[in-house]
UniProtKB/Swiss-Prot annotation:
Gene name of this polypeptide: Pdgfra
Deletion phenotype: Embryonically lethal. Most embryos survive up to 13 dpc, but display important defects in skeleton development, including spina bifida, fusions of cervical vertebrae and ribs, and incomplete fusion of the skull parietal bone. Embryos display also abnormal mucosa lining the gastrointestinal tract, including fewer and misshapen villi and loss of pericryptal mesenchyme. At about 16 dpc, embryos display extensive hemorrhaging.
Pfam families in the record: I-set, Ig_PDGFR_d4, PK_Tyr_Ser-Thr, VEGFR-1-like_Ig-like
Transmembrane segment boundaries: 529-549
Protein kinase domain segment(s): 593-954
Source organism of the structure: Mus musculus (Mouse)
UniProt-recorded name of the protein: Platelet-derived growth factor receptor alpha
Length: 1089
């Protein structure tokens, strides 16, 4: 009974599996029943294993490798299973564990569970158990314990562990070896047996990176494929160096997949396993699984993904709306279609069979990918309109399939009345009222009538108009696609009545009313309405005329003199020119002036060539230019011209400004007499001499002259542009002797006409001897030669002279406000003179000026703070100077070529747009322009610094020539200079002097005293400027302290009259000036401020 029970128990466990606790068997037993046993060398021993099921042995040596080991089964009558292991001729290699276990409990992956006994076979010649092939390699996880398996054949043997000759402390067990935490490297075990020392071979310890948990990630590029495509799946293991990874997939049986391993060590350890299945078929659909197992620990992780393979691509669409849809007018509505497709589809929308444009703002389409093969397409109506009604179609297609869906959309529009009019039937008095309405759905039209016109504000006075009323006919509505028209006819209207048209549909009801007037009353109303309309037209016409008259541009002088500045520097107070005194010394008799041809004409006045008699001692007859207003000038314009005269009298003379010579203000129109400039304005001169410049500089490419508005191939056009500037208000070339207009005036008989007058002595620069290789070039710059050849040095000379002239104006706190090449004239000897030529320019028809209120502004020349903040300072003139440089080195080009002055232009200026370098400018010159165009005014250079910068670009001989000419000008009896001095001979008649030096001192004192008395009527209190130290005075140029003046003008508006000697000027030069009776300070007149 006991035997059969044991057999039944074993069979039950075999059938149900070893994992059930109810089938758990007792472990087999080993005889002898000991944990360990020592066996003599070369002796024999046997071990018996007894168990309730079939048992087997595990031992150090396999039966195939060792014939001295024999395992056999024995039968007994107890029903137990017995297996005997017998070893003959035992050796040290038989030392180790012997385990007896049940066969049914053992699998390939599980550890052996059973009874164990350890056998020692001491061998005096072999202290350590022989090692296997892999025993010398010890793999351990980082910071984990490990066993170095140097086992001894005798349990009594003492063993030590060494690492590179160093003793390593560690716990030792003769059945396992040394146990502990070891660093990476070689280790040797050493034992001494009966005086003999035994050493093992090296044990190499390797540390591998591993974690307690496997971090496994699976990635499939896609999960849907077509037949013939390649399936790619990857699994990545992180932070583990030794991992066993197995793939399970549908094609594994056919060995179809290709596996690859890639190791990535940076920034962290990563093992990437890739499975590739080429030429996939439908059979390759299914689950793809990767299972990773750690090499040093019993840790496993698994990931899987489902992949489907289709014979061909597919498209499926699922709309979320019906085939008939309606939206309300101005409603925002989305129509969503769910799409599933592979490969990636192309989705398009059509309206009434026409493709919708993607950039429409009222109807938009959008496609979003939600999953690998799932998409969502949206058609969005933004504020739906009536014309949005129609048939909409979505088409989804790829290379293998196509699907579409169409729906009809209607826009529901509330009823509205488009028109309500009455038609008269002639003298019979009959009238027909037509009411046109629209809406979706089409509205219905009803009629109502109110016979008591005064009570029509009350709804109870209205009655529905029946179709069977006598003398009234109601017609059926005429229906269109979205409009309907209803009519009602009245045979005769004898009194005023009101008719109401009602249009209604499901969305709204609207009404409109119309009065029907009897024919007699209508004629009376028509006459009254006509009179009223005529009266309104007259009133509006008068208003328009007044506005036009007030907006008519008025002449005003652009120059302004700064009186004071607010502490924050954002508000400037300018001197009122009318409050300035006018010195009668400037008055010139009218009978001494003969007027000739017109040099320039504008909307307000003109400039005329004239001949002045007795203007100076050295030149009794002088050619001059005369400014005057037109006979139609208004009083405000006369006042502006007088203001210009007063400002010029107080500025004083300078070589590089158009100097005032005299004026006629009494007994007739105001004449301002100024210097006559031989070559006219600078723009004209640059245009005219462009070809000569290009011939001297062949390295400059002759590009299209678009910036000039010229066609280089059309000589007639170019000639016209150069020679016809009188018509558009520019200063005419004074060398021309063509037939021009003349101003009739008294002509003195005893003198020749203006054409025979000799040139002014002050217009002819002094000659000088050739001193260097550059003298010939400099001589062409400042000479009396009529040659008009233009060179790069000429352009630099113009640039320098304008800077000097503007430096002088800045020293007087004078802001020009219209600095441009058209306001720069060229005198004999190519002397540049700055002027304000707005009086003789037709600015209303000049494209360079833009209308703003009642004035015209040169916007392209203006600084940003002047354009946007109406702020004009010397530093805003610096900006204009940069534009002027661009004009000069583009040979008269128009700034910002091709750009209109509009909102785009203003936005570009605000955003920092600047012009590129003109063709003929050097990098140094362009750098000056860029500095002048700094958006922050305080960072722009002053005219003093600009003069110094340009001066350094010119030959040294040029500087000396210029200073000599400037000095000669100030020493001459030029009317502009002479009138600012007191005639010493007249002032001190009868006084005897010991020497000329005493006479000069008294003359200077008299001049200063007279100056103070002349200006005492108008003195503006401004803070003084610190005097220049004597040490610095020797290194500065002879100027009116313009640098100090310009910089301080930003804060105080003050100026200084300190005399500063130039670098290239000698003390002898100043003494020579003193000898001729000129105070050194007279070189730069004291500001009237």
């Amino acid at each position: 009974m006991g035997t059969s029970h044991q057999v039944f128990l074993v069979l039950s466990c075999l059938l149900t599996g070893p994992g059930l606790i109810s089938c758990q068997l007792l472990l087999p037993s080993i005889l002898p029943n000991e944990n360990e046993k020592i066996v003599q060398l070369n002796s024999s021993f046997s071990l018996r294993c007894v168990g309730e099921s079939e048992v087997s042995w595990q031992h150090p040596m396999s039966e195939e490798d060792d014939p001295n080991v024999e395992i056999r089964s024995e039968e007994n009558n107890s029903g137990l299973f017995v297996t005997v292991l017998e070893v003959v001729n035992a050796s040290a290699a038989h030392t180790g564990w012997y385990t007896c276990y049940y066969n049914h409990t053992q699998t390939d992956e599980s550890e052996i569970e059973g009874r164990h006994i350890y056998i020692y076979v001491p061998d005096p010649d072999m202290a350590f158990v022989p090692l296997g092939m892999t025993d010398s390699l010890v793999i351990v996880e980082e910071d984990d314990s490990a066993i170095i398996p140097c086992r001894t054949t005798d349990p009594e043997t003492q063993v030590t562990l060494h690492n590179n000759g160093r003793l390593v402390p560690a716990s030792y067990d003769s059945r396992q070896g040394f146990n502990g935490t070891f660093s990476v490297g070689p280790y040797i075990c050493e034992a001494t047996v009966k005086g003999r020392t035994f050493k093992t071979s090296e044990f190499n310890v390797y540390a591998l990176k591993a974690t307690s948990e496997l971090n496994l990630e699976m990635d499939a590029r896609q999960t849907v494929y077509k037949a013939g495509e390649t399936i790619v799946v990857t699994c990545a293991v992180f932070n583990n160096e030794v991992v066993d990874l197995q793939w399970t997939y549908p094609g594994e049986v056919r060995n179809k997949g290709i596996t690859m391993l890639e190791e990535i060590k940076l920034p962290s350890i990563k093992l990437v396993y890739t499975l590739t299945v080429p030429k996939a078929t439908v059979k390759d659909s299914g689950e793809y699984e990767c299972a990773a197992r750690q090499a040093t620990k019993e840790v496993k992780e698994m990931k899987r993904v489902t992949i489907s393979v289709h014979e061909k691509g597919f498209v499926e669409i699922e709309p979320t709306f019906g085939q008939l849809e309606a939206v309300n007018l101005h409603e925002v509505r989305e129509f969503v279609v769910e799409v599933q497709a592979y490969p990636t589809p192309r989705i398009s929308w059509l309206k009434d069979n026409l493709t919708l444009i993607e950039n429409l703002t009222e109807i938009t389409t959008d496609v979003q990918k939600s999953q690998e093969t799932r998409y969502q397409s949206k058609l969005k109506l933004i504020r739906a309109k009536e014309e949005d009604s129609g048939h909409y179609t979505i088409i989804v297609q790829n290379e293998d399939d196509v699907k579409s869906y169409t729906f009809e959309l209607s826009t529901l529009v509330p009823a509205s009345i488009l028109d309500l009019v009455d038609d008269h039937h002639g003298s019979g008095g009959g009238q027909t009222v037509r009411c046109t309405a629209e809406g979706t759905p089409l509205p219905e039209i009803d009629w109502m009538i109110c016979k008591h016109i005064k009570k029509c504000n009350n709804d109870t006075s209205w009655t529905v108009l029946a179709s069977n009323v006598s003398n009234i006919i109601t017609e059926l509505p005429r229906r269109g696609r979205s409009t309907v028209e209803g009519r009602v006819s009245f045979a005769k209207v004898e009194e005023t009545i009101a008719v109401r048209c009602l249009a209604k549909n499901n969305l709204s009801v609207v009404a409109r009313e119309l009065k029907l007037v009897a024919p007699t009353l209508r004629s009376e109303l028509t006459v009254a309405a006509a009179v009223l309309v005529l009266l309104v037209i007259v009133i509006v016409s008068l208003i328009v005329l007044v506005v036009i008259w007030k907006q008519k541009p008025r002449y005003e002088i652009r120059w302004r003199v700064i009186e004071s500045i607010s502490p924050d520097g954002h508000e400037y107070i300018y001197v009122d020119p009318m409050q300035l005194p006018y010195d009668s010394r400037w008055e010139f008799p009218r009978d001494g002036l003969v007027l000739g041809r017109i040099l320039g004409s504008g909307a307000f006045g003109k400039v005329v060539e004239g001949t002045a008699y007795g203007l100076s001692r050295s030149q009794p007859v002088m050619k001059v230019a005369v400014k005057m207003l037109k006979p139609t000038a208004r009083s405000s314009e006369k006042q502006a011209l007088m203001s210009e005269l007063k400002i010029m009298t107080h500025l004083g003379p300078h070589l590089n400004i158009v100097n005032l010579l005299g004026a006629c203000t009494k007994s007739g129109p105001i004449y301002i007499i100024t210097e006559y400039c031989f070559y006219g304005d600078l723009v004209n001169y640059l245009h005219k001499n462009r070809d000569s410049f290009m011939s001297q500089h062949p390295e400059k490419p002759k590009k299209d002259l678009d910036i000039f508005g010229l066609n280089p191939a059309d000589e007639s056009t170019r000639s016209y542009v150069i020679l016809s500037f009188e018509n558009n208000g520019d200063y005419m070339d004074m060398k021309q002797a063509d037939t021009t207009q003349y101003v009739p005036m008294l002509e003195r008989k005893e003198v020749s006409k203006y054409s025979d007058i000799q040139r002014s002595l002050y217009d002819r620069p002094a000659s000088y001897k050739k001193k260097s290789m550059l003298d010939s070039e400099v001589k062409n710059l400042l000479s009396d030669d009529d040659s008009e050849g233009l060179t790069l040095l000429d352009l630099l000379s113009f640039t320098y002279q304008v800077a000097r002239g503007m430096e002088f104006l800045a020293s007087k706190n004078c802001v020009h406000r219209d600095l441009a090449a058209r306001n720069v004239l060229l005198a004999q000897g190519k002397i540049v003179k700055i002027c304000d030529f707005g009086l003789a320019r037709d600015i209303m028809h000049d494209s360079n000026y833009v209308s703003k209120g009642s004035t015209f502004l040169p916007v392209k020349w203006m600084a940003p703070e002047s354009i946007f903040d109406n702020l004009y300072t010397t530093l805003s003139d610096v900006w204009s100077y940069g534009i002027l440089l661009w004009e000069i080195f583009s040979l008269g080009g128009t700034p910002y070529p091709g750009m209109m002055v509009d909102s785009t232009f203003y936005n570009k200026i605000k955003s920092g747009y600047r012009m590129a370098k003109p063709d003929h400018a050097t990098s140094e010159v362009y750098e000056i322009m860029v500095q002048c165009w700094n958006s922050e005014p305080e960072k722009r250079p002053s005219f003093y610094h600009l003069s110094e910068i340009v001066e350094n670009l010119l030959p040294g001989q040029y500087k000396k020539s210029y200073e000599k000419i400037h000095l000669d000008f100030l020493k001459s009896d030029h009317p502009a200079v002479a009138r600012m001095r007191v005639d010493s001979d007249n002032a001190y008649i009868g006084v005897t002097y010991k020497n000329e030096e005493d006479k000069l001192k008294d003359w200077e004192g008299g001049l200063d005293e007279q100056r103070l008395s002349a200006d005492s009527g108008y003195i503006i209190p401004l803070p003084d400027i610190d005097p220049v130290p004597e040490e610095e005075d020797l290194g500065k140029r002879n100027r009116h302290s313009s640098q100090t003046s310009e910089e301080s003008a930003i804060e105080t508006g003050s100026s200084s009259s300190t005399f500063i000697k130039r670098e290239d000027e000698t003390i002898e030069d100043i003494d020579m000036m003193d000898d001729i009776g000129i105070d050194s300070s007279d070189l730069v007149e004291d500001s009237f401020l």
